[in-house]
Design a protein with these regions (language model features):
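Short beta-strand to alpha-helix junction loop
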Residues: 59-70, 94-104, 140-160, 169, ...
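Dinucleotide-binding Rossmann-like beta1-alpha1 core, especially the glycine-rich loop
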Residues: 50-126, 136, 256, 277, ...
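Flavin (FAD/FMN) cofactor-binding core of flavoprotein oxidoreductases
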Residues: 125-128, 220-224, 230, 234, ...
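Conserved Rossmann-like nucleotide-cofactor binding loop
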Residues: 14, 39, 205
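Helical element adjacent to the flavin cofactor pocket in flavoenzyme catalytic cores
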Residues: 140-197, 201, 205-208
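Glycine-rich FAD pyrophosphate-binding loop
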Residues: 23-46
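Flavin-dependent oxidoreductases
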Residues: 17, 177-287
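Beta1/beta-strand and adjacent pyrophosphate-binding region of the FAD-binding site
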Residues: 1-14, 32
Length: 347
């Protein structure tokens, strides 16, 4: 008999939320979660800007749109119930020129279609009342957007999973997976674990976990590092809340933006440059295996061929603080080079 009904690989917020939800849907089910690090939420879940996204950008009716709108409501309810620090502060999406006004109006329509109530289109004068130092000519105010302490969410999910009878095993790197006798067997350096159902929530390593489980790896993870600057102490007040540019649908990134952090301070960024390791939070983090995996993947080269200018600009921005600052000045013209210093990074 298997040790667990559900064997989950990956202790980020997706794996933890999956485990907790399974326990809620099937009370009494046996859940075992395997996490390779010494604690949960150590990678993407702990290396992000802490934004609660509300689903503004997604195609109405799409799974992303439905889940984003539903998810932010559930996350806010969860945080309120658990006493986790969060704030629904809203955000501004700013049009910097006439060309972006049409896309801004389209976003307004899309947001309403996705069920986001209270969206406001602000002309420049009204926009400056909300954010006195912002540039641009118009903005959307989206009240649903917020900020949260995601590592605290991960810790609380882990606590509840264990309280409900689940098992969270840390320091358990999955090195092998096989299906045998109607159950899955996960091998780690120190033990083997069994489960009737296997759930892959391994984040940046999910393609490799799928491969060792016997799936053909047609898609690969190509790591991109998002680097942030932060506003220096005493200059955080230049920006009050969250400020985003109007996204360009041609590109897969939102562009640099300003994010107020839940524990204080203000971040600006990120850029998006290829990382040399899947856990490459520093420029000096290099994994030859990860680099080989990325460089031999045709999908990467198709992406570069499709977006050569953007690829070059993002790489330039990675190594040039001045270039990064110029990108920020499109949203807040009064930002100076001396106002920013290196912050965190995510992959």
């Amino acid at each position: 008999m298997a040790d667990a009904d559900f064997l989950i690989v990956g202790g980020g917020i997706v794996g933890l939320a999956t485990a907790y939800r399974l326990q809620s849907m099937q009370p009494g089910c046996r859940v075992r979660l395997l996490e390779k690090e010494a604690e949960v939420g150590q990678h993407q879940s702990g290396h992000n800007s802490g934004v609660l996204h509300c689903g503004l950008y997604y195609k109405p009716g799409s799974i992303k749109a439905v889940l984003a709108v539903r998810g932010i409501r559930q996350m806010v309810e969860f945080c309120e119930e658990a006493g986790i620090k969060h704030e629904v502060c809203g955000k501004l999406v700013v049009a910097c020129n006439e060309e972006e006004l049409g896309r801004l109006r389209n976003l307004e329509v899309r947001g309403r279609q996705n069920g986001l109530e209270g969206i406001e289109y602000l002309e420049r004068e009204a926009m400056l009342e909300v954010e006195p130092n912002v540039g641009g000519i118009a903005a959307l105010r989206v009240p649903q957007e917020g900020i949260v302490d995601y590592p605290a969410v991960c810790r609380e999910l882990k606590r509840r999973i264990v309280e409900n009878g689940g098992v969270v095993v840390t320091g358990a790197t999955v090195t092998g997976l096989r299906e045998q006798g109607g159950q899955w067997i996960a091998r780690t350096p120190v033990d083997e674990y069994t489960g009737t159902f296997l759930v892959n929530c391994a984040g940046l390593h999910c393609d490799r976990v799928a491969e060792i489980a016997g799936e053909k790896r047609e898609t690969r993870i190509v790591p991109f590092r998002g680097e942030y600057y932060k506003l220096k102490s005493g200059r955080e007040g230049i920006v009050r809340n969250l400020i985003y540019p109007v996204p360009d649908a041609q590109f897969p990134f939102l562009g640099v933006h300003f994010t107020r952090l839940i524990h204080g301070g203000m971040e600006a960024g990120p850029n998006a440059a290829m990382a040399f390791a899947r856990e490459g939070y520093l420029k000096t983090n290099i994994s030859l295996r990860d680099m080989w995996d990325a460089m031999t993947y045709p999908g990467l080269w198709r992406f570069v061929a499709k977006h050569p200018r953007m690829t070059a600009l993002e790489l330039w921005q990675t190594f040039s603080k001045r270039r990064f600052c110029r990108a920020l000045q499109k949203l807040v013209p009064s930002i100076k080079l001396s106002d920013i210093e290196p912050g965190g990074a995510g992959v």
